[in-house]
Amino acid sequence: MYYKYDITYSNDVANEKEYLINLIDSPGHVDFSSEVTAALRVTDGALVVVDTVEGVSVQTETVLRQAMQEKIRPVLMVNKIDRSILELKLDGEAMYQSFLRVIDMANVVIATYVSEDMGEIQVDPSVGNVAFGSGKDQWAFTLAKFSRLYSTKFGIAIDKMMAKLWGDNYYDAAGKKWRTDGEAEDGKPLRRAFAQFIMDPICKLCQAIIDGNVEQYTKMLKILGLELSQ
């Protein structure tokens, strides 16, 4: 797979902008653990895909354990969020809590089996090693994508913006302040930044596509620098 790094919204100064990536699809079932081990021994990293509705399964734990044994650093893909939006019809806060449970469960497994010489390898959206998306519909994002969009608006560096978009961070528009207590200066409850600035636009985009509102979804896709395939 050829990948060219999108520097449109980035201030990164890394030397490499183009990559050739070889992906090995290994079985996740516990009965094929030897095949997973063989794949891990010829790779530089592991992309662990977890169903956000089903959560971390026995198979997921087995794969993470094997990655730790082979000293392979994992990254996490929280998959099937289309089900959360269209099937379960969860709001942004409920989806955040669902994603958080998956990430926390994965980190418990990692912490259980990691060796000290591997250093800090916990998966955390705010550092860029967790993606969210829909394999079925062929789209995904990391917090970095939205951080690049919002960093200019809020006058915050991209890495700091990523931290604002995860965890207990809320924006008080009236007071023009970021808060961590979920309550505005006037005592009114605030919406979590991840729900407000990421999931709300995604849910609105999905609904606009379903409703056939071409004008609305075309405008939203343009802001994201995306095109909708036929």
Q: Predicted regions: what is each one?
A:
Residues 1-230:
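Structural and coupling elements of P-loop NTPases
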